């Protein structure tokens, strides 16, 4: 099942800051407005610029615009179950997917581990010491990204409006 983003943050961020990139005056080169190499304060703090920001070329709205890499779920050949593979080259810093699922307490997570049993695949991702995302019964394809001793992805917490999102 595909889940909607359910992770919410009850604290307000205090409004979206305007970027100091010169975007409103057309001072930034095309494609660089709030991009990886820009001076966008929001991006440096892992806060996405909201649609209300006054420049249409903003490169810091990837989660809102679902600008994910093209990927595909596949059955692994080595008995590990399901995996996720890229259908295109992914560069360092690119957004692969958003990790989406049901947000539960760590106590609920422990109870679900007992309920699911040892043979049931689980897809938990800890947000902090008190909260966990459980993507076992509903979530995005990001739950099929497997552990690696030689990892090529990382998780990042991003603020989008009043929500906290987990980007990979």
Q: Which ranges hold each PLM region?
A:
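Short amphipathic alpha-helical segments embedded in low-complexity Lys/Glu-rich regions
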Residues: 40, 113-114, 161-162
